[in-house]
Amino acid sequence: MLNIKLNIVILAAGKSTRMNSDIPKVLHLLAGKPILQYVIDTAIKLKAKCKSTNIYIVYGYKGELLQQKLAHKQKTFLHWIKQVEQSGTGHAVQQVLPFLGKDEEVLILYGDVPLISFQTLIHLLTTRSKQGLSLLTANLTNPDGYGRILYKEQEVVGIIEHQEANAQQKLISEINTGILAVSSNELKIWITKLTNNNSMNEFYLTDIIALAWQEGKKIHTIHPEKISEINGINDCAQLANLERLYQKEQAESLLRIGVIIADPNRFDLRGELKHGDNIFFDTNVLIEGQVSLGNQVTIGTGCIIKNTVIGDNVIIKPYSIIEEAHLANGSIVGPFAHLRPGSKIEENAYVGNFVEIKKSTLGKKSKVAHLSYIGDANIGKDVNIGAGTITCNYDGANKHQTIIGDNVFIGSDSQLIAPLTIGDGATIGAGTTVTSNVTSNEVIISRIRQFPIINWQRPKKKIRYNIIY
């Protein structure tokens, strides 16, 4: 626990010009989550580690949309402050000054730098001296576009923005990430001394570094553990590159703890994955939302799994889509199966090729092997659903339930017209349309009687001859 009063300022007022999109840059998705949400989540983690914390988001372009998309999740944590005119980072921070108390810590973050880690920020806060500031910097092989760190006798004396730097300064490889920790008392003084006497006519927050040095304040620098932590997003190419980098990092983290991934370059995790032992992911698997896997789970190529709980010894065959479902131990799904929200597959049940299940329970050891639609149904144990069976659950206005008992056999190409109850041990003949309840152990057949025609001959096509002269 840090015994400090912390103010986290997240700058998110940019117009996102280079994204060429009507959507604010910080609302674009990285691994399925808005870019800004990553920074907010990290800020909330810090909140739990400090004596008290306020989180301020400085917004501008389409700020109402930002609040609509994000604020509902953390209403009590976030304070939204509008920057009416975008006049640089110093001007953005100035909007927060009236809300800062005396002798408090201020941490500056950026809404378009999503992967900054909790550990790095804790390090940044703990290294700041009482009479100075801490600055997050990094050494890059290609520092183009970044402000450069200026030293004099091994002490940081300032930051020069790329567009203001001379040829010699542009050779400096240590760059400013923009992320810093500073005292509220000193920040208030230094912000008022900023000028916009530069090529962009903006108030640069980075100019407070030179002001701090001139006053003899100690300026600490630390580096992030990974360069990806400080990667900013300004255009679609940078977003795509960071997506691939982040996905590979997640895959490598899973590999290190024993999860087998056939190809880390073709694995996507857009959410949170909890898992047991002996997990195998084939290529091009997508995990979304909150997914939990038991032990001995195999997921075939091309599968999409979203907000689902999967038990032990489960096999998901290729190209299956599973969302908001529950799969019990020993179940098998696919290939080409679709489990929609509310599907519950019980122990050792089987869902096969081109089967769609929605808001239904498939009991223990029951099978729906081929080409079927099961919707709003409760199916018992040891049931066999033949190929092409459909639960007709919708009457054009309302959905109705189908209840099937234990040990029921449903023949192929049957239609079950809900609302409907089929008792234990019943048998439904192939091609039957069931319109009323079936009692236990009853056999139901409703199809046209077969009539044989003796000595019938199939019509033959006439042979046409083309004469070529």
From Swiss-Prot:
It is found in: Cytoplasm. It comes from the Bacteria. Keywords: Acyltransferase, Cell shape, Cell wall biogenesis/degradation, Cytoplasm, Magnesium, Metal-binding, Multifunctional enzyme, Nucleotidyltransferase, Peptidoglycan synthesis, Repeat, Transferase. GO terms for molecular function: glucosamine-1-phosphate N-acetyltransferase activity; magnesium ion binding; UDP-N-acetylglucosamine diphosphorylase activity. Catalyzes the last two sequential reactions in the de novo biosynthetic pathway for UDP-N-acetylglucosamine (UDP-GlcNAc). The C-terminal domain catalyzes the transfer of acetyl group from acetyl coenzyme A to glucosamine-1-phosphate (GlcN-1-P) to produce N-acetylglucosamine-1-phosphate (GlcNAc-1-P), which is converted into UDP-GlcNAc by the transfer of uridine 5-monophosphate (from uridine 5-triphosphate), a reaction catalyzed by the N-terminal domain. The keyword Nucleotidyltransferase applies. InterPro entries: Bifunctional_GlmU, GlmU-like, GlmU_C_LbH, Hexapep, Hexapep_transf_CS, MobA-like_NTP_Trfase, Nucleotide-diphossugar_trans, Trimer_LpxA-like_sf. Pfam families: Hexapep, NTP_transf_3. Disulfide bonds: none annotated. UDP-N-acetyl-alpha-D-glucosamine binds at residues 11-14, 25, 83, 88-89, 110-112, 147, 161, 176, 234, 340, 358, 373, 384. Mg(2+) binds at residues 112, 234. Residues 258-469 are annotated as: N-acetyltransferase. Homotrimer. The active site is at residue 370. Pathway: Nucleotide-sugar biosynthesis; UDP-N-acetyl-alpha-D-glucosamine biosynthesis; N-acetyl-alpha-D-glucosamine 1-phosphate from alpha-D-glucosamine 6-phosphate (route II): step 2/2; Nucleotide-sugar biosynthesis; UDP-N-acetyl-alpha-D-glucosamine biosynthesis; UDP-N-acetyl-alpha-D-glucosamine from N-acetyl-alpha-D-glucosamine 1-phosphate: step 1/1; Bacterial outer membrane biogenesis; LPS lipid A biosynthesis. It catalyses: alpha-D-glucosamine 1-phosphate + acetyl-CoA = N-acetyl-alpha-D-glucosamine 1-phosphate + CoA + H(+); N-acetyl-alpha-D-glucosamine 1-phosphate + UTP + H(+) = UDP-N-acetyl-alpha-D-glucosamine + diphosphate. This is Bifunctional protein GlmU. Its cofactor is Mg(2+).
